[in-house]
Structures are given as structure tokens and as C-alpha cells.
Amino acid sequence: MIKQLNQNEIDEIRKKIDSFKTDDYYKYYFDETEENNPDKAFLIDDKYYIDFTIYNDICFMGVIDISKEIKTTSNSVYELLKLFDEQLKYYQKIAQWCYKANKIAYRFHKFLKKKYNCVSFEDKEKSMIGVILLWKDMKA
């Protein structure tokens, strides 16, 4: 189930996420270079927090598992892709970065490269991808 969050809910989850910074499981989720003030945020199945934040006129999508005790279901993955498609129609382009050592996120990048028109860049540590909605892909 996808739930769009209000500002109070976002603030509560951000506090929880901040507490993960010392947890080794989450070591690949943080990059302290930018403040995160989401334009929109969602929760999928009480497990995945997804936010869409604008940096320099580009929408970045962030995804974090906030409840590693809950098992991932195929429905969660379907909901994530559904949300991505909906927000791509809204924002027209979405970027995402990850540490390549974060195998789950890096696999998601590879999937996006196969499914969508995108540009990508990789260095030794990070992968960055930008997905662009083309005119031919827009549905009325």
C-alpha cells in the first residue's frame, strides 16, 4: 500500500532515519553533502520511505528501508515501480544516486537503465542515473 505522507509524518520518519546513521546496515544510505527537504514523500507497506526532493531544478528520488524486520514482498516492489511511474509523469525527470556497494540500490539502477530512457554515470564508488519521460511515453 502506498501512502502519501504529510509534513508531520515526514518529520517523524526523518527523525527515525537520522537515528540510522550509526547503524552499519545503513552505511550506504547517507551522503551529508545536501540537506534533504522533500517536495513529496511516501511510505510503502510501512517498510519503504520514498521521497522526492528538488536540488537545482532536478528531482531526486530517495528510498530507504525503515523497517528491516519486515520482509520485502513482491507487492512492495510493484508499488515502488508504480509510484516511480506516477511521479515520473509528474516531475518529467527523476534522478537517483547510490553507492555501488549497496547491492539492492545498484540492482534497481540497472533495472531502471533497462526499462527507461535515461542517462547514467558511474565512478568507483557511486552510480547516478537520470530517467527522462519522453514525449512518446506520455499518456493523456
Predicted feature descriptions by range:
Residues M1-Y28:
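Short amphipathic alpha-helix that is part of the acyltransferase structural core
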Residues T72-Q87, R107, F111:
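Conserved acetyl-CoA-binding loop-helix of GNAT-fold acetyltransferases
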Residues A41-D45:
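Cytosolic beta-strand hydrophobic patch enriched in CBS
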Residues D31-N36, K47-I58:
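A conserved beta-strand-loop-helix scaffold within acyl/acetyltransferase catalytic domains
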Residues W97, K115-I132:
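Conserved catalytic-core motifs of GNAT/GCN5-like acyltransferases
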